[in-house]
C-alpha cells in the first residue's frame, strides 16, 4: 500500500485535487470529513469541545455551530492549540481504523488540511501540496464560499506558510490557473509518479536510478532533509543517526557534478537491527536490495572508534542497502553499523571533499571519465571509480588525522 499525504492552504484547491486522485483510482481519506465526523452529536469529540469552549458553540438541536466555534478557536494561538489538541488525535485514530481495512496494493490519499502544522508529513512516502497565492485564495473564499474577507485572511494567516509547505512537498502543484489545468497536472503526476511508485512497492522493486552525471541541483539538500526526516520516523530509536552522504551532500559547489540520486546513511547498532528495519523501510517506500551486502574492503581500515581502528576484517565492511521505489526521487539508503570503517568513511568522505578543492577536482575527473566509459550503465560506472577510492581512502584519513576530524 502506498500512502500519500495531500495538503494545501484553505482555498488552494485541495478538494479538486483529491477528487481527481479519487477518479484515478486512489482511496481518499478526507481529513475535513473525518474532522466533522468526530464531533457529531453524541461523540467524545463534541463533548470535549463543549468542555473547552462552552455550550454556546452548540446549535439548538445539539449539533456543533461551526461559526461560533471558529470565533472562539481562531482568536489566538492558545485557543487554536486547544482545538487542535482535541480534534487531531480523534481524527488520527479514525484515519488509522479506515486504513487498516484497506487492501495491500491500494493507493491511499490522505487529505489532511493541517498536515504541515501537525508535523505529519514524514509519516508519508509521498507528500503532494497544492498551492495558490494568498490573494487568489482570498478571492476564491469570498466569491465561492461567501466568507467575509477578514475571516478568509485570518484563516489563511492561521495556517502554515508557503515556505513551510514547500519544505515538506515532494510534489508541488500550482493551482493559479483554471480547474482544468490542475486536473491535467494531477493526472500527469498520478500516471508518471504515483502509479509507478505504488506498483514498485507492491512488487518490492526499486525505481530505476539515472546513471548520468548532472550539474549540482541546489534543491538536493532540501530533498535530502525530507528523506532524512522520513527515515527517522520509519526507523525510530533503532536509527542512531541518519545522514545525507555521497556526492549530492557536497553542497555549495555548482561545478561539482553528480548522479541525481540522493544517498542516505542510517547508522545502527548491528546488522541484526538493520535486518529488523526491512519492513518499516519498505512501508516508507524503500525496498531492500538483497544482492548488495557489503562495501569494497580497504586495507588498514580506519575508525574513530578505537576497537575498529587499523583493522583488516572483511566483516566490518558489511551493510544493508535499500533504495526508493519512487521514480520521481531515486534514493539509496545504506544501513551501516556504528563505528565500522564503512560507516565512518561515508561520513568522512563528504567532509573531506567539502574541505579540499583538490580532492573535489580529482574526484570529478574520475567521475567524468567513468561516466564516459560506462555509457549509462550504472554498474560499470561504479566499478570504474573503485580503483581511485583505494588511494582516496588513505588521503581522506590523513586529512582526518591532521584536523582531528570526528563524525
UniProtKB/Swiss-Prot annotation:
Q: Summarize where ATP binds, as residue positions.
A: 11-16
Q: In which pathway does it act?
A: Cofactor biosynthesis; coenzyme A biosynthesis; CoA from (R)-pantothenate: step 5/5
Q: What parts of the sequence cross the membrane?
A: none
- Molecular function in Gene Ontology: ATP binding; CTP binding; dATP binding; dephospho-CoA kinase activity
Domain DPCK span(s) in chain numbering? 3-204
Q: What is the effect of changing residue 14 to A?
A: Shows a 50% increase in the Km for ATP and a 19% reduction in kcat
Q: Which UniProt keywords apply?
A: ATP-binding, Coenzyme A biosynthesis, Cytoplasm, Kinase, Nucleotide-binding, Transferase
Q: Which Pfam families match?
A: CoaE, GrpB
Instruction: Just give the chief location class.
Output: cytoplasm
Q: Which GO terms describe its cellular component?
A: cytosol
Q: Does the keyword Cytoplasm apply?
A: yes
- Subcellular localization: Cytoplasm
Q: Which PROSITE patterns match?
A: DPCK
Per its UniProt record, what CDD domains does this chain match? Answer: DPCK
**So what does mutating residue 140 to A actually do?**
Loss of activity
Q: Which domain of life does the protein's organism represent? A: Bacteria
Which BP terms from GO are recorded? coenzyme A biosynthetic process
Note down the stretches annotated as region UPF0157: 211-407
Q: Per its database record, what is this protein's job?
A: Catalyzes the phosphorylation of the 3'-hydroxyl group of dephosphocoenzyme A to form coenzyme A. Can also use dATP, with lower efficiency, but cannot use GTP, dGTP or CTP.
Q: What is known of its domains?
A: The C-terminal UPF0157 domain is involved in the proper folding of the full length enzyme.
This protein's assembly is summarised as: Forms monomers and homotrimers. The monomer is the active form and the trimeric form is inactive. Shift from inactive homotrimer to active monomer is induced in the presence of dephosphocoenzyme A. A dynamic equilibrium between the trimeric and monomeric forms regulates the effective concentration of active enzyme.
What more the UniProt record tells us is: Was identified as a high-confidence drug target.
Supply the name of the protein: Dephospho-CoA kinase
Query: Which gene produces this protein?
Result: coaE
Amino acid at each position: 500500500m502506498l500512502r500519500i499525504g495531500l495538503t494545501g492552504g484553505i482555498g488552494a484547491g485541495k478538494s479538486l485535487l483529491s477528487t481527481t486522485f479519487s477518479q484515478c483510482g486512489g482511496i481518499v481519506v478526507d481529513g475535513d470529513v473525518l474532522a466533522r465526523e468526530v464531533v457529531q452529536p453524541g461523540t467524545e469529540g463534541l463533548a470535549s469541545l463543549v468542555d473547552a469552549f462552552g455550550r454556546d458553540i452548540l446549535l439548538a438541536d445539539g449539533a456543533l455551530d461551526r461559526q461560533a466555534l471558529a470565533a472562539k478557536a481562531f482568536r489566538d494561538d492558545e485557543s487554536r492549540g486547544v482545538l487542535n489538541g482535541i480534534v487531531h488525535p480523534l481524527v488520527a485514530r479514525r484515519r488509522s481504523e479506515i486504513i487498516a481495512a484497506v487492501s495491500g496494493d491500494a493507493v491511499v490519499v490522505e487529505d489532511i488540511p493541517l498536515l504541515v502544522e501537525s508535523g505529519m508529513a514524514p509519516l508519508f512516502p509521498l507528500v503532494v501540496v497544492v498551492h495558490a497565492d494568498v490573494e487568489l485564495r482570498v478571492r476564491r473564499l469570498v466569491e465561492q464560499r461567501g466568507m467575509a474577507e477578514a475571516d478568509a485572511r485570518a484563516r489563511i494567516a492561521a495556517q502554515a506558510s508557503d515556505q513551510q509547505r514547500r519544505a515538506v512537498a515532494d510534489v508541488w502543484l500550482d493551482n493559479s490557473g483554471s480547474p482544468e489545468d490542475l486536473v491535467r497536472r494531477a493526472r500527469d503526476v498520478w500516471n508518471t509518479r504515483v502509479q509507478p511508485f505504488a506498483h514498485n512497492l507492491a512488487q518490492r522493486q526499486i525505481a530505476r536510478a539515472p546513471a548520468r552525471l548532472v550539474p549540482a541541483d541546489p534543491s538536493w539538500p532540501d530533498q535530502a532533509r525530507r528523506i532524512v526526516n522520513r527515515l527517522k520516523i520509519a526507523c525510530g530509536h533503532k536509527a542512531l543517526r541518519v545522514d545525507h552522504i555521497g556526492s549530492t551532500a557536497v553542497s555549495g559547489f555548482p561545478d561539482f557534478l553528480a548522479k541525481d540520486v540522493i544517498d542516505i546513511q542510517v547508522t545502527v547498532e548491528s546488522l541484526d537491527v538493520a535486518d529488523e528495519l526491512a519492513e518499516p523501510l519498505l512501508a516508507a517506500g524503500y525496498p531492500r536490495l538483497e544482492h548488495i551486502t557489503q562495501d569494497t574492503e580497504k586495507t588498514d581500515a580506519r575508525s574513530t572508534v578505537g576497537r575498529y581502528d587499523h583493522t583488516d576484517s572483511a566483516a566490518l565492511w558489511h551493510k544493508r542497502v535499500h533504495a526508493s521505489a519512487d521514480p520521481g526521487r531515486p534514493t539509496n539508503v545504506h544501513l551501516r553499523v556504528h563505528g565500522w570503517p564503512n560507516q565512518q568513511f561515508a561520513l568522512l568522505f563528504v567532509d573531506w571533499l567539502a574541505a579540499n578543492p583538490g580532492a573535489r577536482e580529482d574526484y570529478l575527473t574520475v567521475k567524468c571519465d567513468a561516466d564516459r566509459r560506462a555509457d549509462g550503465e550504472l554498474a560499470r560506472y561504479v566499478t570504474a571509480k573503485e580503483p581511485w577510492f583505494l588511494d582516496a581512502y588513505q588521503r581522506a584519513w590523513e586529512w582526518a588525522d591532521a584536523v582531528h576530524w570526528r563524525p
